[in-house]
Swiss-Prot record:
It comes from Saccharomyces cerevisiae (strain AWRI796). InterPro entries: AMPK1_CBM (IPR032640), CRP1_MDG1_kinase (IPR050827), Ig-like_fold (IPR013783), Ig_E-set (IPR014756). Cruciform DNA-binding protein which exerts an enhancing effect on the cleavage of cruciform DNA (X-DNA) by endonuclease VII from bacteriophage T4. Residues 337-363, 385-398, 404-428 have a biased composition (Basic and acidic residues). One of its GO terms (molecular function) is DNA binding. Residues 166-177 have a biased composition (Low complexity). Residues 160-161 are annotated as: X-DNA-binding. It holds the Pfam family AMPK1_CBM. The modification Phosphoserine is found at residues 153, 156, 271, 319, 343, 394, 440. It comes from the Eukaryota. Keywords: DNA-binding, Phosphoprotein. This is Cruciform DNA-recognizing protein 1.
Length: 465
């Protein structure tokens, strides 16, 4: 068992300041316990005070609006130079204990409250027994009182019946004393009450509303005095939702094409400013001739870069661009020219074979620089065989076409006039071809149109003229 003594004590400070805080040895002088302001304006707080011995003291101090102060209503002691504290002894604490077992509420300004229940431990059996005995005694007393009242009421009823038999009166005229026979209080009308005594939500019922209030707790149906004059009761409209939506959509789509004519007007205004050609037919012909003239130049330049083989003979170079420049003639003449062109292709193939053989025997060495010249590969047997077969196939086609047309003799005479190039001429042609390869493609393309084109097709033109 600890020898500590505990007492509830109320600390107070008079009215005036805004805040008052209590501090002391209980919180190591931290100032953590504020006093509660009461309705009177003063500050109070009730708290338990612990004392280790009877001779021990409880030291404390007040902090009023941030200033440490000492109250004159409590005892003072000097701890050191210039420092004073209030203190309480056991005698001061015992005097204030008015009610044993009562506690005070600090938030309520130190008001007393009932004895708090036990915080821990099982409830005592003696208190239970006492409560049971008290409850039994109360019940027995209530039973005795109820039996006495019943006896008295029965005796009074018997006496009244005897009196009724003597005087000739009935029990209906006599009022009983029991609760069942007591009449109910008569309901009082609100209108009869004094003007000051009225309900929170007064109800003013008029003659019109009383007729329509058929349902209890609700307004009821509304009866209109003139239903025939109201259009909503007579007119009925059947509206199709799809038709109505179509109409509305059509009406809304009208303002959309407004921007159309503005664009067209701008185009029409700008159109006359465009230049118009006087002779469009002549211009198209000139463009076509220019294209035909450029195509042979491209064909002549491309083999210099890509093909490893040498260029064909000058006669072949002259004959190819002339074929593109053939002027439109009648149908029979065009067919003849096509056949003659195929015959020249066979001659070109033969000239290429002769050039390849001559290059194998004698290689021409020149001092001119070589531009993009690929190494020459020897021809295989298959390639030579294909070269031999190609002129035979072309001759067979020529014969078939000659049989269909009646100009066999003219073609044979013209082909016999053509002479095959000799070995010396082939050497000269190879030297010229190597020089042309070293030259730039632009220079070759510019020099070609300056040469006079005298070949097979040139002779044909002279004949037709």
């Amino acid at each position: 068992m600890s020898s500590e003594l505990m007492f509830n004590y109320t600390f107070s400070w008079p009215a005036g300041p805004k805040d008052v805080i209590l501090t002391g040895t209980f919180d190591d002088w931290r100032g953590t316990l504020p006093l509660v302001k009461t309705a009177k304006g003063n500050f109070e707080i009730t708290m338990p005070v612990k004392l280790a011995n009877k001779d021990d003291t409880f030291q404390f101090k007040f902090i009023v609006d941030g200033v440490w102060c000492v109250s004159d209503s409590y005892k003072k002691e000097h701890v050191s130079e210039g420092i004073e504290n209030n203190f309480l002894q056991i005698t001061d604490l015992v005097e204030t204990q008015e009610v044993a077992g009562a506690s005070r509420i600090p938030e309520a300004g130190g008001l007393l409250c009932g004895k708090p229940p036990r915080s821990a431990g099982p409830p005592s059996t003696s208190n239970r027994k006492k409560n049971k005995r008290n409850n039994k005694k109360r019940r027995s007393k209530l039973k005795k009182k109820s039996t006495k009242n019943n006896k008295k009421s029965n005796e009074s009823l018997d006496d009244n019946e005897e009196e009724d038999g003597v005087t000739g009166t009935t029990t209906e005229d006599v009022t009983g004393t029991s609760r069942e026979e007591t009449p109910l209080a008569e309901p009082t009308n609100v209108s009869k009450e004094a003007p000051g005594n009225f309900h929170i939500l007064p109800i003013d019922q008029s003659a019109d509303t009383t007729q329509s209030n058929g349902i209890i707790g609700g307004p009821g149906p509304v009866l209109v005095p003139n239903p025939g004059e109201i259009k909503e009761f007579t007119e009925i409209r059947d509206v199709d939702a799809r038709e109505l939506n179509e109409r509305l959509n059509k009406k809304e789509e009208v303002p959309e094409p407004v921007a159309g004519p503005i664009v067209e007007s701008s185009v029409t205004e700008k159109s006359p400013a465009l230049p118009q050609a006087d002779d469009p037919i002549v211009e198209t012909k000139e463009v076509a001739h220019n294209v035909q003239e450029l195509t042979p130049q491209v064909e002549a330049v491309t083999p210099l870069i890509n093909e490893p083989e040498p260029l064909p003979t000058p006669e072949a170079q002259i004959s190819i661009p002339e074929s593109t420049k053939v002027e439109p003639v009648e149908g029979s003449l065009q067919s003849k020219l096509v056949e003659k062109r195929e015959s020249t292709e066979g001659v070109l193939d033969g000239s290429k074979k002769v050039e390849n053989k001559a290059k194998k025997d004698e290689e021409v060495f020149t001092l001119d620089p070589i531009v993009n010249k690929a190494p020459k590969l020897p021809l295989t047997d298959e390639q030579t065989a294909e070269g031999r077969k190609s002129p035979a196939v072309s001759e067979e086609k020529e014969k078939k076409k000659k049989q269909e047309k009646g100009s066999k003799e003219v073609k044979r005479s013209e082909t016999s006039k053509e002479k095959k190039p000799s070995a010396k001429e082939v050497k000269k042609q190879t030297v010229k071809a190597s020089k042309k390869q070293t030259a730039s493609p632009l220079s070759s393309s510019t020099e070609e149109p300056k040469k006079k084109k005298t070949g097979f097709f040139g002779k044909l033109k002279k004949l037709f003229k």
